[in-house]
A protein has these predicted regions:
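Divalent metal-cofactor coordination and adjacent catalytic microenvironments
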Residues: 1-212
Length: 212
């Protein structure tokens, strides 16, 4: 596999900061290290996903929604991935049957946290509120179609990604594990997330839903 070049890709997909922001943090004015900085941005973004057990980019659109399947562990509630815009919820009675049961918002199910959409946050849980219950005896019995992730990347995530990407880039140039810049200060580098990054991301951590 050939290494991506600037001509092929000036910015990786699904990342949480920009080349310009990291350049500025590192006080780099030329483009000689752009590919390495982009690799650091991509790695930092995926480290953030892993730490938070969620992704902050958007999957799908209303015109082309994404389908995910879930295995309920309770008849009354279902933990799901971050959902921005649900378009359809269906269930089936067993593992191999068709998804014939359609769930309607406010009559069959509620989305929680209920106030999240008003503040630009996704919903993460479904509640069964009427006669239907989630079929939890078999795996992958709930099918949800919609737009997933976050409408906009939270500011704390953007800042965390810039800090972590800067550290990853500087790390390869610092064999003794110590580096510094005017903006970052003197730092001891290691393979973990920066403590400030962890603090920024703390409120965004969650337990991951059972999607397949």
């Amino acid at each position: 596999m050939s290494r991506p070049t600037l001509a092929q890709s000036s910015q990786p997909n699904n990342v949480y900061t920009t080349l310009a922001d990291v350049r500025n943090a590192l006080q780099i004015e030329d483009s000689l290290d752009d590919n390495d900085i982009q690799a650091a941005i991509l790695a930092a973004s995926r480290m953030i996903d892993e730490y938070c057990q969620r992704s902050f980019y958007q999957e799908g659109t209303l015109a082309a929604p994404v389908i995910k399947y879930y295995t309920p562990v309770s008849p009354w509630y279902l933990e799901i991935d971050d959902l921005i815009e649900p378009t359809e919820v269906r269930s089936r009675a067993n593992q191999s049957g068709p998804f014939t049961q359609v769930w309607n918002l406010d009559t069959d199910i509620m989305y929680e946290p209920v106030n999240n959409p008003e503040i630009g946050m996704p919903v993460t849980r479904l509640l069964a509120i009427q006669t239907y219950v989630f079929p939890y005896f078999f795996p992958q019995t709930v099918k949800i179609t919609g737009v997933w992730g976050f409408k906009a990347i939270p500011y704390e995530v953007e800042l965390a990604c810039k800090i972590q990407a800067s550290r990853l880039f500087v790390r390869k140039q610092s064999p003794f594990g110590i580096a510094g810049s005017v903006e970052l200060g003197t730092v001891r580098l290691n393979s973990r997330l920066d403590p400030d990054v962890e603090m920024l991301l703390k409120t965004y951590r969650r337990n991951f839903g059972l999607a397949y």
